[in-house]
Curated annotation (Swiss-Prot):
One of several proteins that assist in the late maturation steps of the functional core of the 30S ribosomal subunit. Helps release RbfA from mature subunits. May play a role in the assembly of ribosomal proteins into the subunit. Circularly permuted GTPase that catalyzes slow GTP hydrolysis, GTPase activity is stimulated by the 30S ribosomal subunit. This is Small ribosomal subunit biogenesis GTPase RsgA 1. Belongs to the TRAFAC class YlqF/YawG GTPase family. RsgA subfamily. It is found in: Cytoplasm. The gene is rsgA1. SUPFAM superfamilies: Nucleic acid-binding proteins (SSF50249), P-loop containing nucleoside triphosphate hydrolases (SSF52540). Its EC number is 3.6.1.-. It comes from Lactiplantibacillus plantarum (strain ATCC BAA-793 / NCIMB 8826 / WCFS1).
Length: 298
């Protein structure tokens, strides 16, 4: 019996990487009865008589699990954010950060298309990047697009990790991957095609070795449209709120209508990003409204 990592799934086959070699395997027969589905990124125990014929016997404990894309053990989310005025959205950025936090995945923010900005707008983005760094996020915001310094920072963050790349269509995800690993044009082109097809995405899921890490070559982490959490849990996924909440008068304060709220006091004092608080309020209302719909199902 061997231990390896599933690097690709396609049509019921799982390609498992172990000891420098790839093995083509299937899931053992009782997986379907037990409703167990191996995922790309799973660490597994398997037997293989030859590299072309083997069986996955057991799936080791998963650290994280995503639905879209269906990948296990992702521990880094590279958030590619287009910074041009017509594309930039702190709302989308904060949605992505909350979704990653809920999934237990560390974010890396990459501000793209900075070379298209005027100096004035770039300074605004730089100020915002510094504000996110103060919250505790790692942010890359170089003046020159895909500069050696920016790419080196991504490579350092990626080394030894399993990552998904997320961001709106056209943000620069494919271009970033091409710069990190020249020669990936075909694979990243497939990402773009899948994104443009909307729901009709490829059913093949793979992990591509890039910069001493692994990147899922799927349309990306896209399950951030709806948060599957309770509204009163949302505050736990805003790190700056968590730090301040110890000084709120009421335990369980959600920082909206409560008196003597440390978060609202910090906001009034200009110590919090107003956009972050505004987005928090919108997400809170969205979750409250969605929960009613969920409870009516079935």
């Amino acid at each position: 019996m061997k231990i390896g990592q599933i690097r690709q799934s396609l049509s019921g086959f799982y390609d498992v990487y172990a000891d420098g070699q790839m093995y083509r395997t299937r899931a053992r027969g009782n997986f379907r009865k037990r409703r167990i589905t191996p995922l790309v990124g799973d660490n597994v125990e398997f037997d293989a008589a030859t590299p072309q014929e083997g069986y996955v016997l057991n799936i080791l404990d998963r650290q994280t699990q995503l639905v879209r894309p269906p990948v296990a053990n992702v521990d880094l989310g590279i958030v590619v954010t287009a910074t041009t005025e017509q594309e930039f959205s702190t709302n989308l950025l904060d949605r992505q950060l909350v979704a990653l936090a809920v999934a237990g995945i560390e974010p890396l923010l990459y501000f793209a298309k900075t070379d298209l900005l005027t100096d004035e707008v770039y300074q605004q983005r730089l100020t915002l990047a510094d504000a996110y760094r103060q919250i505790g996020y790692q942010v890359i915001c170089e003046r020159t697009a895909f500069s050696p310094a920016a790419l080196a920072a991504v490579k350092t963050a990626l080394a030894g990790h399993v990552a998904v790349v997320m961001g709106q269509t056209g943000a620069g995800k494919s271009t970033l991957l091409n710069h990190l690993q020249p020669g990936l044009a075909l694979a990243t082109g497939e990402i773009s095609q899948a994104l443009n097809r909307g729901k009709h995405t490829t059913r093949k899921v793979s992990l591509i070795p890039i910069a001493d890490g692994l990147v899922a070559d799927t349309p990306g982490f896209s399950s951030y449209e709806v948060f599957d959490i309770a509204a009163n849990e949302l505050t736990h996924y805003f790190p700056e709120f968590v730090r301040l909440s110890v000084d709120c008068k009421y335990r369980g304060c959600v920082h909206i209508n409560e008196p003597q709220c440390a978060v609202k006091q910090a906001l009034a004092a200009g110590e919090l990003l107003a956009s972050r608080y505004d987005n928090y309020l919108q997400f809170y209302e969205t979750i409250k409204n969605k929960k009613v719909i969920y409870n009516k199902k079935k």
